[in-house]
């Protein structure tokens, strides 16, 4: 969060020894005024105009969208180029700071809606399975959205059809800032929590499924868990 005092950056670098063991895929937030100065992303899939990027790891296509460029046709062009260039993969994940489908306080902000209206048709074309966001400093997860998905589905295993995806809003990882509770979305959610406490989310990818588990950082309690698969559920008769 780089337009805040320099000590906030110092806090991040305190974790560098541990962070060296992780693959980091940062995307710019609404306070990242020096994002390009502080972060170097040496990837062949990086777009010179927007700073957007993509890469494939372990069969997963990750697409990072930077919110600093609000000339939306640039993002449309970038997504089209990813569709043409990305190699074969099992799953597609979009990373963006704004919660495109969030039940938090910023869910109806104009920039959020602008990115949502721009990116969702391209997500359909790319077959995006999972959208991971932040910005609202609380955890929430949508039902499967798009296609013929039911309005609510609280099952622990979800079966996505073409055009369907899950949206995840990550909680605050540090507890430095929270918003008052806001429930203003007009689309369905199946999990919410961690409005005023830090948390974290684990994701596990295999060729057959994506599994995620969300936890309270204070207590270690699991507050949400779901597995995403493709196609129709297998019945006992099958």
Predicted segment positions?
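Residue-level detector of high-confidence beta-strand sites
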Residues: 133, 141, 225-227
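Active-site glycine-centered loops adjacent to acidic/histidine catalytic or metal-binding residues
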Residues: 29-30, 97, 134-135
């Amino acid at each position: 969060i780089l337009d805040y005092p320099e000590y906030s950056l110092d806090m991040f670098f305190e974790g560098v020894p541990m962070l060296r063991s992780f693959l980091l895929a940062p995307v710019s937030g609404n306070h990242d005024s020096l994002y390009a100065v502080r972060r170097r992303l040496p990837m062949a899939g990086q777009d010179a105009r927007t700073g957007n990027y993509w890469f494939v790891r372990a069969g997963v296509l990750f697409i990072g969208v930077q919110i600093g460029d609000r000339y939306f046709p640039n993002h449309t062009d970038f997504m089209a180029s990813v569709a043409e260039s990305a190699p074969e993969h099992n799953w597609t994940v979009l990373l963006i700071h704004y919660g495109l489908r969030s039940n938090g306080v910023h869910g109806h902000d104009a920039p959020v809606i602008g990115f949502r209206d721009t990116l969702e048709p391209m997500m359909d074309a790319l077959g995006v399975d999972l959208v991971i966001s932040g910005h609202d400093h609380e955890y929430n997860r949508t039902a499967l959205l798009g296609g013929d998905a039911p309005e609510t589905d609280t099952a622990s295993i979800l079966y996505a059809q073409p055009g369907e995806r899950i949206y995840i809003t990550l909680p605050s990882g540090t507890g430095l800032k929270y918003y008052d509770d806001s429930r203003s979305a007009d689309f369905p959610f199946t999990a919410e929590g961690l409005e005023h406490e830090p948390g974290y989310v684990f994701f596990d990818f295999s060729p057959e499924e994506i599994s995620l588990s969300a936890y309270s950082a204070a207590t270690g309690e699991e507050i949400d868990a779901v597995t995403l698969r493709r196609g129709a559920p297998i019945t006992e008769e099958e």
